[in-house]
Every structure is written in structure tokens, then in C-alpha cells.
């Protein structure tokens, strides 16, 4: 059996005391019906769509307003990949997405700043 040096136990205790417990945030979800107004090709491929109806999963969720135009890159239903462009809807089509976002603190250039991680997965028809 290997013995650890005597100084390793206090170090481990000190490290545990200084590490704050990780806190998981909750994804905020909004069910949105959209009308595709444009399939943008340059500079970055994305969809532009007008919000027809938006239903938050809970009262505290911030959904885009009805009538607003949003731009996004469509994702697969599991949020794991961008939807292949051949499966993107065309201009004029009505679609449904389950918009998800997570607010948090991002780090960059040594400065922390508030940020939002967003996902735009399609809902199976």
C-alpha cells in the first residue's frame, strides 16, 4: 500500500474548502411557431423568420415577441448538431422550434460578462 506524504492531506482539505460547489442552471424553454422569411447564404448560412406565436414553458421565460424577426442556425432536435442545409425549410414555410437558452457568466480577456447560450432545435412534425 502506498502512503501519501503528510503534507498532501492538508493540501487536499484546503483545496476542497476553496472550491465552491458547482451549481447547475436550468434551461429556459419557449415553444415558437415561425414563418421563414429568408434563407441567408452569405456571410453565414442561417434562417430569418418572423415569430407567429411564442409560448413560454414557465412565466419567467423570455420568449421573442410575436411579430419579431429572428435569425438563427437550425439545429437537430437533440441540440447536438446543426441541421444539414438540405433539410432546412424554404422561404415561406411555417416551422416550429423549441427555443432554449441558458443565462450565465462567460469569461474572456480576463473579464467576466453576462452571456446567453441559445439553441434553436426543430420540433418533429
Language-model segment annotations:
Residues 26-58:
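Structural detector for short beta-strands of small beta-barrel domains
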Residues 54-64, 104-106:
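Short, cysteine-centered beta-strand-loop-beta hairpins and adjacent loop/turn segments enriched
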Residues 80-98:
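Short nucleic-acid-contacting surface segments enriched for D/E, G, S/T with interspersed K/R
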Amino acid at each position: 500500500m502506498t502512503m501519501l506524504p503528510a503534507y498532501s492531506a492538508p493540501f487536499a482539505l484546503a483545496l476542497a474548502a476553496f472550491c465552491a460547489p458547482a451549481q447547475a442552471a436550468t434551461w429556459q424553454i419557449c415553444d415558437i411557431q415561425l414563418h421563414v422569411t429568408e434563407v441567408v447564404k452569405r456571410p453565414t448560412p442561417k434562417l430569418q423568420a418572423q415569430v407567429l406565436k411564442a409560448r413560454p414553458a414557465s412565466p419567467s421565460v423570455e420568449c421573442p415577441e410575436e411579430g419579431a424577426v429572428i435569425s438563427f442556425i437550425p439545429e437537430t432536435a437533440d441540440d447536438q448538431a446543426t441541421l444539414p442545409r438540405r433539410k432546412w425549410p424554404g422561404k415561406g414555410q411555417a416551422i416550429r422550434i423549441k427555443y432554449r437558452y441558458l443565462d450565465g457568466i462567460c469569461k474572456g480577456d480576463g473579464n467576466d460578462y453576462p452571456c446567453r447560450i441559445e439553441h434553436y432545435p426543430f420540433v418533429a412534425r
